[in-house]
Amino acid sequence: LFFQYMASNTPFQDKKDENILNIRMRDAVEQGLKLPDWCTPEFYSYEHNKNQRIKLKIDENNNATFAVRSFEKDDADIMDSNKAYFASLRWIDTEEKAESLIQYLRNHLQFTDEVELWFLYQGPEYDQIECETVQIDELRADDLKEFYDDFTLDSPRRMTVCR
């Protein structure tokens, strides 16, 4: 199972944006919002997670363009980061969604020096972690696509995004 998440020393927060909803997964499904697969009843952990709140940025077609589910280190035993706060992240599959993630990171970096993006395969032990660092002003949608597309099972990947 692949797992993607963000890590920070500052809690992941909603920004004042009328298009960002903080909503329970089951309420989003009931409202007919078009959600990422991991938020739908067909996903294996939906029944367990349906009452959890998620943050969604909704576009003009009622599609969820960006989804974040926040949690703290105590709630996650597989995190490789030393940061205190985490948010589950699902791959952003279009340039528009990648740009939305970049803007979210830019906003979050107003409150902290860096955010880590992680991509790993749950299960095996790893000897090393592939690491890269990028300044937020230099981060492009293509960088995110490459980060996620070039993943292998051999080692987790971490991209540290800095101010």
Describe each model-derived feature in a short phrase.
Residues 1-163:
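Structured alpha/beta or helical-core interaction and ligand-binding surfaces enriched in interleaved
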